[in-house]
Amino acid sequence: MSALRNQDPEIHDVIQKEVQRQNDGLELIASENFASRAVMEAMGTALTNKYAEGLPGKRYYGGCEVVDRAEELARERAKELYDCDWVNVQPHAGAQANSAVYLTLLDPGDTFLGLDLSHGGHLTHGSPVNFSGILYEAEYYGVEEETGRIDMNRVRDRAKEVQPKMISIGASAYPRDFDYEAFREIADEVGAFLWMDMAHTAGLIAGGVLNDPMPHTHVVTTTTHKTLRGPRGGMILLGDDYENPMGKTARKSGRTKMMSELLDSAVFPGTQGGPLMHVIAAKAVGFKEALKPSFAEYTQQVVDNAQAMGAELRERGYDLVSDGTDNHLVLIDLRNKGLTGKEAEQALEAAGITANKNMVPFDDKSPFVTSGLRLGTPAMTTRGFGPDEFAHVAEMIDRVLQDPEDEDTQAAVEREVKALCDQHPLYDVAMA
């Protein structure tokens, strides 16, 4: 990066410091991961210079024959990865992919049913401060207070009560798998579309360690980072393409449009302008990596590690929402420890451990304080951590949280963290 160092030493210094931070610390934020050098190299190329509004073979600009191939590779690999009929790899982020689904399936003011944000849902599933809760009528289902799990009978009752036009599945802090077949039965009963946002679990689904939503849903969205370990971005998928049931037709021929056509139009020109071709190329690289047998092994290790960390925390007296995990994260309810999520997050960060405060079901604290702590295993599993290391991580977390204001303990744990990370190197700081 000599050109950057010479041209803008301040930004070069920022990047170098961030590489150092990632190298030296324990990254336990469940939505974060470490992209490969190949993925990062694809993003830092001349492809960033090219405008390519439209789709391969049907662009609004000339000179797209080369970038067309990059997008075709991304689409082909994504379809192979998820054994699906159609994908759009252009969404800049998961939120943009989600907005295209709303634009396609709903009209402003329509009712949809999603997982309550305070029970593990996501902002784009109906939060009143997000477009999804501003433009549409959001209703919610949640988890049971005793079990921390979704009760499908309660979901059915709620769906019959509110009669949604769409039901959404997916979460940012739900540690269990979803019963897609049961969700589809409920959606069919009330005549609703079923949409799965697999942003958090896309890699685990691709690796075969979680249930597959494709056979049961009308549409699926995802990010391409998180457990999928590609670049930051979004994607929309259809298990099978089908004629849109809303009866929308092509202007000239009068034929019924396919759902894929409506979703393509909802991405561009509906919610975005030009696609980011350097990121789409990086998505193609990430998908190729995820098609390797080693990626399936990685995803199984992610789950094994989360379960090992959760078991050790439970042994040390921590309450886990749903009493464990099926996926990449554990959610700790800290109320029995007399701690807030904010206090825990700050104490751990001082010890070189990055996690995030999080609402827990039936939380009585604000989103800026919270009663919970969310911990994830994808990033450190990428660095080669196994169950033994994650049991050690749980022990260090407990040591810090026993007295979150003890600076000596924080300093000692930070040294221990650095030594552990040195055994599992990530990036060479010289890359910056």
Swiss-Prot record:
Enzyme Commission number(s) of this protein: 2.1.2.1
Subunit structure and binding partners = Homodimer.
Question: What family does the database annotate?
Answer: Belongs to the SHMT family.
Q: Which cofactor is recorded for it? A: pyridoxal 5'-phosphate
One matching Pfam family, short form? SHMT
What is the enzyme's class at the highest EC level?
transferase
Q: What is this protein called?
A: Serine hydroxymethyltransferase
Q: Which reaction does it catalyse?
A: (6R)-5,10-methylene-5,6,7,8-tetrahydrofolate + glycine + H2O = (6S)-5,6,7,8-tetrahydrofolate + L-serine
The UniProt entry, under InterPro entries, shows: PyrdxlP-dep_Trfase, PyrdxlP-dep_Trfase_major, PyrdxlP-dep_Trfase_small, Ser_HO-MeTrfase, Ser_HO-MeTrfase-like, Ser_HO-MeTrfase_PLP_BS, SHMT-like_dom
Is Cell membrane there in the keyword field?
A: no
Q: In which pathway does it act?
A: One-carbon metabolism; tetrahydrofolate interconversion; Amino-acid biosynthesis; glycine biosynthesis; glycine from L-serine: step 1/1
Question: Which domain of life does this protein belong to?
Answer: Bacteria
What PROSITE patterns does UniProt report for this protein, alphabetically?
A: SHMT
The cross-references to CDD domains, in alphabetical order and at most eight, read: SHMT
The molecular function GO annotations come to: glycine hydroxymethyltransferase activity; pyridoxal phosphate binding
Site (Plays an important role in substrate specificity) at 225
Q: Which Gene Ontology terms describe the biological processes this protein takes part in?
A: glycine biosynthetic process from serine; tetrahydrofolate interconversion
Q: Which is one Gene Ontology cellular component term of this protein?
A: cytosol
The places in or outside the cell where this protein is found are: Cytoplasm
At what positions is N6-(pyridoxal phosphate)lysine found? 226
Keywords for this protein: Amino-acid biosynthesis, Cytoplasm, One-carbon metabolism, Pyridoxal phosphate, Transferase
Q: What is the source species? A: Salinibacter ruber (strain DSM 13855 / M31)
Q: Where does (6S)-5,6,7,8-tetrahydrofolate bind?
A: 117, 121-123, 366-368
Function, in words: Catalyzes the reversible interconversion of serine and glycine with tetrahydrofolate (THF) serving as the one-carbon carrier. This reaction serves as the major source of one-carbon groups required for the biosynthesis of purines, thymidylate, methionine, and other important biomolecules. Also exhibits THF-independent aldolase activity toward beta-hydroxyamino acids, producing glycine and aldehydes, via a retro-aldol mechanism.
